[in-house]
Regions:
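Proline-rich intrinsically disordered, low-complexity coils
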Residues: 10, 83-84, 160
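C-terminal alpha-helix plus adjacent terminal tail
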Residues: 146-179
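Conserved catalytic cores of soluble enzyme domains
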Residues: 15-144, 148, 152
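A structural preference for short, pocket-lining loop segments at secondary-structure junctions
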Residues: 1-22
């Protein structure tokens, strides 16, 4: 992140992670501190930022890379603080309720777009691998558009908007209508 800032280049972040292991070792390894540092650095970065949610975005690490100036998502991507199976196991002591938990969490791109977490959705077929070249071209066009748009705005305009986006993440309406 800092290198992009030092070189005066926009930062492009790709989010595609199943999340960290839910283990004592992960916590003892300083995961929470790294997530906090990433959030802090990204929010205050003095260069335009674009996050691209490609597939799964699970856990604090994925969420820490979300408050960019603009977020692009593949149509079938999803984002959650905890994978729906994990949430189901915690709440219901069974993974059988993962689809219901997914719906309640509003993890799909349609919900993320409606709630203002994603600004740009890139169309993909049932499996982007079936049309990899066309998908990559659409994704490239989306990235080019967002970077070009951001390059026209001064940092004095981008930073307050980025901070506002981050501060209001928890205040958005989720898919089941609850604020």
């Amino acid at each position: 992140m800092r290198l992009a800032e030092e070189l005066g280049l926009p930062l492009l972040i790709v989010i595609d992670t199943g999340g960290a292991a839910l283990s004592k070792e992960a916590e003892e390894g300083g995961l929470a501190g790294e997530i906090a540092r990433s959030l802090h650095d990204l929010i205050g970065l003095q260069t335009p930022t674009v996050s691209v949610l490609l597939g799964q975005g699970a856990g604090g690490g994925a969420l820490a890379l979300l408050p960019a100036d603009r977020t692009i998502a593949a149509q079938h991507a999803w984002l959650s603080p905890l994978p729906p199976e994990g949430a189901s196991a915690i709440v219901h002591r069974s993974t059988d309720f993962a689809p219901a938990m997914s719906e309640a969490q509003g993890v799909n791109v349609a919900s993320l777009y409606t709630n203002g977490l994603v600004e740009h959705v890139v169309d993909e077929r049932s499996d982007a691998a079936l049309e990899a070249k066309a998908f990559c071209q659409r994704l490239g066009q989306a990235i080019e558009y967002e970077l070009a748009t951001l390059s026209l705005a001064p940092m004095t305009e981008l930073l307050p908007k980025r901070l506002h986006k981050y501060r209001h993440l928890g205040r958005l309406v989720v898919s089941n209508g609850v604020s």
